[in-house]
Amino acid sequence: MNHPSLALLDSPPAVAYISVPLAGCRAKRDWGGFAYGVETTTRTDSACNVYRVNIESRGECKRPGGKLVGVTVACAPDNGHVVGCRVDGDFFVEGDDAAVDRYLRRLNAALLDIVQRDITQCDTPPDDPDTVSYLERIARDEHVSVTSANAETILTALRRALSACGRDAARPASSRLASPASVTAHDARRRATPSAASAVPTSSVTITPAASAPQASRGLTPPTFPGEWHERWHRLAPKIVVDKPRRPQEQMDVDVQWSREVAAGERPATIRFWQWASPAVVVGRFQSIPDEVHEDVAAKEGFTVVRRCTGGGAMFIEPGNTITYSLYAPRWFAADLDIEESYRLCDMWLIAALRGLGLDVGFSGLNDIASSHGKIGGAAQRRFPPIGSGPGSILHHVTLAYDIDAVKMTRVLNISGEKMSDKAVKSAVKRVDPMRAQTGLSRDGLIARLADCLTQPDGPGAN
């Protein structure tokens, strides 16, 4: 049901509104299953519907070579007090599901505590070493590993969110963000749950990206891999499956199901080449859909928005332009390796296969695969605990750009300036280097060549 619009409250630029029916509801956005609720004031419209209303502001930060972190703060409209904080982004968090859930909830609560203490006391900058240690301790307590983001990144995003909603000006200079010009709150909008509200016209906000940092080394020199890694692949001997076409949500479900079957010892190690039945935007486990996807444009263009079980960024999927595969392996396969090494192990066969086809490719950052001209694809991982007497499993999936309508991608995805701030090439369109032009192969032909590499006598990734 569409509810009548509420009267707009006087507010600074770069804020958004959430309106929620009072009856048992809480302010909520799609945060990957981690909704946060805030108690705020209420409003009554002309039809006597009672609403809770809060004002939102968002800040972002991305350290060079790392992943984007976004923090959204919710403020009560009557007094401006911050009543909720929420972290989202492209980062990865490794740990069992319950521990990851607890970590995110504690992190959100800690940010709210930091803000409230800072506002009332104004004597300690919230990004001082003690505050950084406070956030780092939460990850240690919950036995999770946060990759490609750190406490300083989270706190900087928090300060930018506060600055965007006008809270920073009331603080002493010692507790303000060091670079106030780097405010990255963006795409302010008015939203209503359960029905969407019309956009609120907002004043323009100047977004000044952080200084450009050198792009991460792409490692285009042919990588070498330890002989012991080749032995792991020989022992793994994965089954190769070129799957039937599946719709987006079914793809997500199959990934989890097959991972759990391997974790239980009910399925052998498998590499599945996906076939997409329809276009999709696949967001990462910890991303905020409204801040990553222009949902109205996606719907108009026929894209289904789904969430995968792994971290990382959004994937733009058109069936004929995308090659996706998943590796489902027992956990021993990546035992005793750090996170970066496990990515290299799982993708060593792919690098060898693409180089065998004449592509100048290598690793970029933690989880990207790139040529000398741009990004070809990205990977993500998740570990599943043993089920019964099973070995546990590691899910490693990769999406490659066979071809791409990059202009359409920029219409559908909401790619912020902060996300591109450490890239030498600032245009998302120019950063993608599809394989179609490089190989001259059809999509099916390229998949067949990749599958052949996995079954060669010397094993995947053999030189």
Give the positions of each predicted feature.
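Short, highly charged C-terminal tails/helix-capping segments
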Residues: H143-T153, N367-I376, N463
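A glycine-rich, hydrophobic loop/mini-helix early in the fold
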Residues: F273, P279, E292-A334
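Active-site loop/lid in soluble adenylation, ligation, and acyl-transfer enzymes
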Residues: N2-E39, R43-L68, E152-P172, R176-L177, ...
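Short amphipathic alpha-helical segments
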Residues: A99, Y103, L107, N150-I154, ...
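Short linear segments in intrinsically disordered or otherwise low-structure-confidence regions
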Residues: R191-A197, T208-A211
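Catalytic beta-strand/loop module used to bind and position nucleotide/cofactor moieties
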Residues: A16-I18, G32, T42, Y51-V53, ...
